[in-house]
């Protein structure tokens, strides 16, 4: 259910400036999107798992605030990451 080290490393490599650039907004959004996708599948299989659903809603809210910040600071990068992650806005 959690993002493995290999998945995290590949996401950081794809979206970050370097392999250790985990603090960049793009990387944080991409990692949250991966976690959200995995938790969404988990919640579909286990509909009564309220704790996971609560965590999912929290992650979606955090990603939304990061996307708002990114839209304010770099509109072109924002549009690019929406296309790459297949997010709708």
Curated annotation (Swiss-Prot):
One GO BP annotation of this record: translation
One term under GO cellular component: cytosolic small ribosomal subunit
Tagged with keyword Ribonucleoprotein: yes
SUPFAM superfamilies according to UniProt: S15/NS1 RNA-binding domain (SSF47060)
Gene Ontology MF terms in the entry: rRNA binding; structural constituent of ribosome
SMART domains named in the record: Ribosomal_S15
Domain of life of the native organism: Bacteria
Keyword entries, A-Z: Ribonucleoprotein, Ribosomal protein, RNA-binding, rRNA-binding
Pfam families per the UniProt record, alphabetical: Ribosomal_S15
Family: Belongs to the universal ribosomal protein uS15 family.
Function: One of the primary rRNA binding proteins, it binds directly to 16S rRNA where it helps nucleate assembly of the platform of the 30S subunit by binding and bridging several RNA helices of the 16S rRNA. Forms an intersubunit bridge (bridge B4) with the 23S rRNA of the 50S subunit in the ribosome.
SUBUNIT field: Part of the 30S ribosomal subunit. Forms a bridge to the 50S subunit in the 70S ribosome, contacting the 23S rRNA.
Cited PANTHER family: RIBOSOMAL PROTEIN S15, BACTERIAL AND ORGANELLAR, SMALL RIBOSOMAL SUBUNIT PROTEIN US15M
Protein's UniProt name: Small ribosomal subunit protein uS15
Organism: Treponema denticola (strain ATCC 35405 / DSM 14222 / CIP 103919 / JCM 8153 / KCTC 15104)
Designated gene of the protein: rpsO
């Amino acid at each position: 259910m959690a993002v493995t080290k290999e998945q995290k490393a590949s996401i950081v490599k794809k979206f970050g400036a370097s392999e250790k650039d985990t603090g960049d907004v793009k990387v944080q959004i991409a990692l949250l999107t991966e976690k959200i996708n995995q938790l969404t599948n988990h919640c579909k299989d286990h509909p009564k798992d309220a704790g996971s659903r609560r965590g999912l809603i929290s992650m979606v809210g955090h990603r939304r605030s990061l996307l708002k910040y990114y839209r304010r600071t770099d509109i072109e990068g924002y549009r690019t990451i929406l296309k790459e992650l297949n997010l709708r806005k």
